[in-house]
Amino acid sequence: KGARENSGEVFGFSLVYSGNFVAGTEVNEFHISRAFIGMNPFDFNWRLNPGETFTAPEAVMVYSGKGFGGMSRTYHRLYRTRLARGTFRDKNRPVLANNWEATTFQFNEDKIIAIAQKAKEAGVELMVLDDGWFGNRNDDTTSLGDWFPNQEKLPNGIGGLAEKIEGLGLKFGLWFEPEMISPESKLYEMHPDWCIHAEGRERNLGRQQLILDLTRQDVRDFIIGFLTDILKNNPISYIKWDYNRNFTDIGSAMLPPERQSEVAHRYILGLYEILETITTAFPNVLFEGCASGGGRFDPGQMYYFDQYWTSDNSDAIARLKIQYGTSLVMPAIMQGAHVSAYPHHSLHRFVPMKTRGHVAMTGQFGYEFDLSKATDETIAEMKEQIALSKKIESVVHFGDMYRLDSPFETDCSSVEFLSEDKNTAVLFHCCTLGKINGAPHFVKMSGLDRASEYACEETGEVFSGAVLEDVGLAFRHSKDFESWIYIFHKQK
């Protein structure tokens, strides 16, 4: 009660689980508060035979006496250093370009190469081929499960394209949606019982697709098999693992009626088995999960995925709230954030390139528009953005995050990233709504060494830590969608 971003007592509860859950608080007749989080009991039963064990998901409880910010920083450090694992845990990630918002399903090898050439010119390090490369996948109604290259689009196959991308000096990444199946696919023709479904009922589609039944060993073997084959036989450095719908009609043809309430949890156990197998077999592949459109971004996924596409809404101004809210528990190093098109392809908002870049730099930085059409001016600006991203990424990804201005409460957003030794601070500020003759907005920093002096790299000005925290920096909000990034270095 009464807790704020930087003050008050906060109790945080987070579940290391990717399945159905329930969380809540209640007060009993003696005015005692109770908080709970765990597996959702709705439609869940589990037969536990003599001698068997059942392991419930872990709940991670955090106490903070320094408000929501203190809670978040505890979660960030804990999950980044103790839950995340693997080759990339303590490394900065490559700057990537993804073709999805540039082409959707309509592309060929020449188009992808054209995007990659401009990406390389700008300094991008990884080219990702998204949805549409397999089967007869020309829209979202078909071919999930048919994981072989579309010869019309890619006459030289995945391997041929990947070699050309690598020949440009880029790494190559590939999109999959391994957990899904299209009713219009060769896989469904052969195995119509392989999807999650309730016997005797119509199978309801989400995004024109069904979910594979991961409770089945044959389905898990199939997924592990095709992923292993493609990763072994092609120079792939990155996998984007999508998940575009959630559950309906939960049931499995493999379980008897009295055990159908085990399906949802068994699915998650099956998913974890697949992810454990694949990520262990290919430790040098960077794996990125996707929160949209199935709405799955949780600590259970963080154990397997190096980073996560935070939302399919890539509009920079919308992302201020999305990334702010996600940061309550998830660290910046986990949040995929890309520079999208001008205007944005779905919101049609005109956000300057500078601001789109700044917003993306507060997460895992990349690009998501048609680079093949980029002008020399755009390429030059991209080079500057990538250079700035490289300069600040270690502080953003491995430092402490302080939320200073909430986009939910003000017409701006401010976030500070502070290195562990407090020697370097990165301040991001964005105005979402300009004002005529408005008073300056002061952004007060946090976590600094108050007795030391900090020099601003961009302006050359020197401030004490106490002044930066108690008075702050003044910003004029003279126009919409303007942003700033300032870097501060503690003086010896």
Label each region the model flagged.
Residues 182, 187-221, 265-372:
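Glycan-recognition surfaces
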Residues 88-225, 238:
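Aromatic-lined carbohydrate-binding/catalytic grooves of carbohydrate-active enzymes
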